[in-house]
Curated annotation (Swiss-Prot):
It comes from Rattus norvegicus (Rat). The lineage of its organism: Eukaryota, Metazoa, Chordata, Craniata, Vertebrata. Residues 537-978 are cytoplasmic. This is Macrophage colony-stimulating factor 1 receptor. Glycans are attached at N45, N73, N302, N335, N389, N410, N449, N478, N491. Belongs to the protein kinase superfamily. Tyr protein kinase family. CSF-1/PDGF receptor subfamily. Pfam families: ig, Ig_PDGFR_d4, PK_Tyr_Ser-Thr. One of its GO terms (molecular function) is protein homodimerization activity. Present in an inactive conformation in the absence of bound ligand. CSF1 or IL34 binding leads to dimerization and activation by autophosphorylation on tyrosine residues. Residues 580-914 form the Protein kinase domain. InterPro entries: CSF-1_receptor, Ig-like_dom, Ig-like_dom_sf, Ig-like_fold, Ig_sub, Ig_sub2, Immunoglobulin_dom, Kinase-like_dom_sf. Keywords: ATP-binding, Cell membrane, Disulfide bond, Glycoprotein, Immunity, Immunoglobulin domain, Inflammatory response, Innate immunity, Kinase, Membrane, Nucleotide-binding, Phosphoprotein, Proto-oncogene, Receptor, Repeat, Signal, Transferase, Transmembrane, Transmembrane helix, Tyrosine-protein kinase, Ubl conjugation. Residues 921-957 are annotated as: Disordered. One of its GO terms (biological process) is positive regulation of macrophage chemotaxis.
Length: 978
């Protein structure tokens, strides 16, 4: 069934509409009490500017300069009208909000003590009432209690003050504003009004915007306006030397005559570009303003730097890396990244962004640079033109470090001078008589300049290590040999003294010495290699980490996440571990297990509740224990929601950490769908199926010899750590009997699939409202409980990530690549919008009844290119056209064009309502048909075609034993080793 035109129009407005800026909180007026914290936020498509009684009582948010105003202690002086204007688009206009700060002790807020106008103008006396309830009792008096002149025409505006129409010279005076508060008169201080006689001058002009860029075919507007106290003036708009014939609009505002010529272009072309001039003239003179209008073929994003991309500084110096970006449309995401090679002891990167019209300045601050901070620094930015980047290479300069050693070589004495530093130091040898600590060329008996020392090491961004040899034959009595080194950073030297022949040395027997040294060096080399191998294996071993991330703040694509270890833990969650009676192990993985348990007295003193308990292995490392504690803190921070697996309690004292969560009796959604698939053979819902598709679902159970543990809620029956592996037939049978006894035997309806989809979307909308990014949205991570309620969870403890084909090795992480958005795969960017992409894959899983996404496609470079080029899977068999449209919108390559979870909820609920009404509870068909061999991704339905199958073993992978037993992935950050 199709979405009606009104619904489509609504979505187009939500996703792509542009208009005036929006001020939050909404409403034309806001009334607060003194001392309250007030925050005004302006939401717009571009740069904004605030106008009103701002300084010094307000602060601008440094993380979003210009868009957010905050005052921590509101006073009557904050009363006034605040206007937010978008700088880059005059068509968008502006939005205002008026703030009242009710202060019984101060009924008036004066914005000025003196007002000067020209005769005939409107004179505004800016005494603002602080309480809107007092505006009915206001009055205006002259100083000394005298009445206002009878011929003076004035009125009161709560937003502006008292306004005198067409002020005359005789109106010059000091005025006071009065009102009644609780029966008493409250008077403002005086405002001096000075009315000057008119002096003719050229018109004042304004040309907006000051600069304009549009893509060919877009709309644009250029506004040329002029004002003057006299009506006799003219205004024209020119492009180059050509006068444009544009209608003239006239108005009279604030005692000034205003004339406007507005050029509106519905679809700009290259001939519309050029220099535009706004010219206004009268008998007194002429004023002119100009602006540049640029029309481009497509969106652009250019990154440049006035600095060299190859930077060299000394250790301990500070450096600012600056990049300028010229972009249209606005940049949506950006981030600075350190690309190595030294990843140990890295500080958090500090940077700021300065915005102007169509231009950005990104600055990265490197303060007191350490040796480990040398390397590549990468700025990545994105707008509708795509991604662009700029890379700086920072090399540190080191002064020379020198070491002199002696060693016999072939019976001859040789001195070795080992030097490290950058730039490569020069080496000079000197021989001086006697035992001395200093020697220069004047004192030296001999001087050798080694112009070609041996380079031992020359790694990028590191010191150069060289060695110079001085063969001297036989060491001379009472001589000192100096090795002096120098580079642009500094110099260093070391000496070697030769003593008398009788004392000099007892040279070891070279025939014995050399083999011993070689043997020792060989053993040491083997030990070092073994140590490096063990270290590499340890680094490659995945660690249990917290998957969910809470955003603290963001600017562009620069996210600051809350450190979960710093979140407070509320002791109200503490539950006596003695009140837990453990049952069978529900699932186990590399890091821990999930155990069924009965909790006595949880919530109520006499309550008995079945729960699921997460715990670590006894061999868990300290960082894994910290990760589980962080997960506990995040769950408590998020709060409760019907569609997430909620925290019920925890045991953190007197033993290992235990996290108590809700128990979900039907297991994970993926296996639930696969179990139900045998009864859903759907000729009425799945047109065009062929006979081959029958096998797609008949083989799903594979004689029930494999049991999935990835949800953490399947039955094993013994309280041991169980890896994800095939189990015996008897064990499998008991599992299906136990869980399927609780499952309703009726076949699924289309409404059920819509119900699951809507509930997951509601859970994701809740997480998004809490600034939480999930990063592994998939059917295997959704559990079902009583009433077929779907809950989103985090089950990393019950996963053997090393053996799950759904997770692909990328760098030092295992990633669910087929569920990931392109920006996450290619650029390590994770946002709520990337969760929306993953949700689209989950929808495909639901409406294909548990098939693996991208069937028949291996995860390799060809897969990455397909995703990057916009390839989309075909419409699943059981998905109505409108549901497939939602999937496609979730898979938009431009993240900002993807729907929000709130919009997805609305669409799914509307579809479910229509399904209830039109299908009259029609079940999915239960006999006779087949699902179609291409049900999960055959022909791509019009715009794209299915790629050629690369591996038969990958086709319909849900039918393979290894896939049925696949475990879930350890919760990690899912970031590449960038």
């Amino acid at each position: 069934m199709e979405l009606g035109p009104p619904l489509v129009l609504l979505l187009a407005t939500v996703w792509h509409g542009q208009g005036a800026p929006v001020i939050e909180p909404s409403g034309p007026e806001l009334v607060v009490e003194p001392g309250e914290t007030v925050t005004l936020r302006c939401v717009s498509n571009g740069s904004v500017e605030w106008d009103g009684p701002i300084s010094p009582y307000w602060t601008l948010d440094p993380e979003s300069p210009g868009s957010t105003l905050t005052t921590r202690n509101a006073t009557f002086k904050n009363t006034g009208t605040y206007r937010c204007t978008e700088l880059e688009d005059p068509m968008a206009g502006s939005t205002t909000i008026h703030l009242y700060v009710k202060d019984p002790a101060h009924s008036w807020n004066l914005l000025a003590q003196e007002v000067t106008v020209v005769e005939g103008q409107e004179a505004v006396l800016p005494c603002l009432i602080t309480d809107p309830a007092l505006k009915d009792s206001v009055s205006l008096m002259r100083e000394g209690g005298r009445q206002v002149l009878r011929k003076t025409v004035y009125f009161f505006s709560a937003w502006r003050g008292f306004i005198i129409r067409k002020a005359k010279v005789l109106d010059s005076n000091t005025y006071v504003c009065k009102t009644m508060v609780n029966g008493r008169e409250s008077t403002s201080t005086g405002i001096w009004l000075k009315v000057n006689r008119v002096h003719p001058e050229p018109p004042q002009i304004k040309l907006e915007p000051s600069k304009l860029v549009r893509i060919r075919g877009e709309a644009a507007q250029i506004v040329c306006s002029a004002t003057n106290a006299e009506v006799g003036f003219n205004v024209i708009l020119k492009r180059g030397d050509t006068k444009l014939e544009i209608p003239l609009n006239s108005d009279f505002q604030d005692n000034y005559y205003k004339k406007v010529r507005a050029l509106s272009l519905n679809a700009v072309d290259f001939q519309d570009a050029g220099i535009y001039s706004c010219v206004a003239s009268n008998d007194v003179g002429t004023r002119t303003a100009t602006m540049n209008f640029q029309v481009v073929e497509s969106a652009y994003l250019n990154l440049t730097s006035e600095q060299s991309l190859l930077q060299e500084v000394s250790v301990g110096d500070s450096l600012i890396l600056t990049v300028h970006a010229d972009a249209y449309p606005s940049i949506q995401h950006y981030n600075w990244t350190y690309l190595g090679p030294f990843f140990e002891d890295q500080r958090k990167l500090e940077f700021i962004t300065q915005r102007a019209i169509y231009r950005y300045t990104f600055k990265l601050f490197l303060n007191r640079v350490k040796a480990s901070e040398a390397g590549q620094y990468f700025l990545m930015a994105q707008n509708k033109a795509g991604w662009n980047n700029l890379t700086f290479e920072l090399t540190l300069r080191y002064p020379p470090e020198v070491s002199v050693t002696w060693m016999p070589v072939n019976g001859s004495d040789v001195l070795f001078c080992d030097v490290s530093g950058y730039p490569q130091p020069s080496v000079t040898w000197m021989e001086c008589r006697g035992h001395t600590d200093r020697c220069d060329e004047a004192q030296a008996l001999q001087v050798w300049n080694d112009t070609h020392p041996e380079v031992l090491s020359q790694k990028p961004f590191d010191k150069v290590i060289i060695q110079s040899q001085l063969p001297i034959g036989t060491l001379k009595h009472n001589m000192t040999y100096f090795c002096k080194t120098h580079n642009s950073v500094g110099n260093s030297s070391q000496y070697f003294r030769a003593v008398s022949l009788g004392q000099s040395k007892q040279l070891p027997d070279e025939s014995l010495f050399t083999p011993v040294v070689v043997a020792c060096m060989s053993v040491m080399s083997l030990l070092v290699l073994l140590l490096l191998l063990l270290l590499y294996k340890y680094k490659q071993k995945p660690k249990y980490q917290v998957r969910w991330k809470i955003i603290e703040r963001y600017e562009g694509n620069s996210y600051t996440f809350i450190d979960p270890t710093q979140l407070p833990y509320n002791e109200k969650w503490e539950f006596p571990r003695n009140n837990l009676q453990f049952g069978k192990t529900l699932g186990a993985g590399a890091f821990g297990k999930v155990v069924e348990a009965t909790a006595f007295g949880l919530g109520k003193e006499d309550a008995v509740l079945k729960v699921a308990v997460k715990m670590l292995k006894s061999t868990a490392h300290a960082d894994e224990k910290e990760a589980l504690m962080s997960e506990l803190k995040i769950m408590s921070h998020l709060g409760q929601h019907e569609n997430i697996v909620n925290l019920l309690g925890a045991c953190t004292h007197g033993g290992p950490v235990l996290v108590i969560t809700e128990y979900c009796c039907y297991g994970d959604l993926l296996n639930f769908l696969r179990r139900k698939a045998e009864a859903m053979l759907g000729p009425s819902l799945s047109p065009g199926q062929d006979s081959e598709g029958d096998s797609s679902y008949k083989n799903i159970h594979l004689e029930k010899k494999y049991v999935r543990r990835d949800s953490g809620f399947s039955s094993q029956g013994v309280d041991t750590y169980v890896e994800m592996r095939p189990v015996s037939t008897s064990s499998s049978d008991s599992f299906f009997k136990q869980d399927l006894d609780k499952e309703p035997s009726r076949p699924l309806e289309l409404w059920d699939l819509l119900h699951f989809s809507s509930q997951v979307a509601q859970g994701m909308a809740f997480l998004a409202s809490k600034n939480c990014i999930h990063r592994d949205v998939a059917a295997r991570n959704v559990l079902l409980t009583s009433g077929h309620v779907a809950k989103i969870g985090d089950f990393g403890l019950a996963r053997d990530i090393m053996n799950d084909s759904n997770y692909v090795v990328k760098g030092n992480a295992r990633l669910p690549v087929k569920w990931m958005a392109p920006e996450s795969i290619l650029y390590c960017v994770y946002t709520v919008q990337s969760d929306v992409w993953s949700y689209g894959i989950l929808l495909w899983e639901i409406f294909s009844l548990g098939l693996n996404p991208y069937p028949g496609i291996l995860v390799n470079n060809k897969f990455y290119k397909l995703v990057k080029d916009g390839y989309q899977m075909a419409q699943p068999v059981f998905a109505p056209k409108n549901i497939y449209s939602i999937m496609q919108s979730c898979w938009d390559l431009e993240p900002t064009r993807r729907p929000t979870f709130q919009q997805i909820c609305f669409l799914l609920q509307e579809q479910a309502r229509l399904e209830r009404r039109d299908q009259d509870y029609a079940n999915l068909p239960s006999s006779g048909g087949s699902s179609g061999s291409d049900s999960g991704g055959g022909s791509s339905g019009g715009s794209s075609s299915e790629p050629e199958e690369e591996s038969s073993s990958e086709h319909l992978a849900c039918c393979e034993p290894g896939d049925i037993a696949q475990p879930l992935l350890q919760p990690n950050n899912y970031q590449f080793a960038c």
